[in-house]
Amino acid sequence: MINIEIHPDSDFPIQNLPYGVFSTISNPSLRVGARLGDWVVDLAILDNENLFGRRYGFFRDSSLNRFMAAGRDVWREIRQRLIRLVGEEQASLKKEALIPVHEVQMHLPVEIGDYTDFYASREHATNVGIMFRGRENALMPNWLHLPVGYHGRASSVVISGTDVIRPRGQVKPKDAPPEFTASRQLDFELEMGFFVGKGNDLGEPISIETAHDHIFGMVLLNDWSARDIQAWEYQPLGPFLAKNFATSISPWVVT
């Protein structure tokens, strides 16, 4: 009989159960799993055994995209069933469905089609504004009225632990011409990233009242920034090379 023990201080109790994409040495195929304590639950095996009540098929995918697109009713149904399976119905689980976390290799959880970074913290916007424009002009007038953001580079989103190469670009020394060099002011920003699951038709806005039904889950996000490159290039259209070289996210998506 399987007995899953979870340390009281674990970040991954039964109340969490985040989703991710993983592989193992014995089975290099990418598939979907859920984190429970020091274990990864192989959802593809559970699905193959019809333990969710019906077979979904998307847990054998190399990304969460089809699962995310299924919508909130399916998300809720699977989560409720998974909680029962790893809780009161542990006896129905196969041993092969539980893999020690140190034996898995994590992968990017989602095929990311687009990525928008919002400038949502007043304190952060003020501090960066002071860095570039001085204290008197730190906060731009539009910040108080609209969600300031920029489109990042989806192809350079990587999971935590991936090496980040220091970017090179133009910087403008004081009282000297711009020069092409490696960034000397590489910065990091701890943020939260939201994955949108169910989409919308082109040109049709999502209302505030229904936005919750479209948000699949959250990850920790590090918006790497080359501040010296950014200071020279950001006017008039905002950051470009200063922020498109890497964005790190956690491999587990908390829902």
Regions found by a protein language model. Give the residues of each.
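Active-site microenvironments in enzyme catalytic cores
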Residues: M1-T24, R35, A44-T255
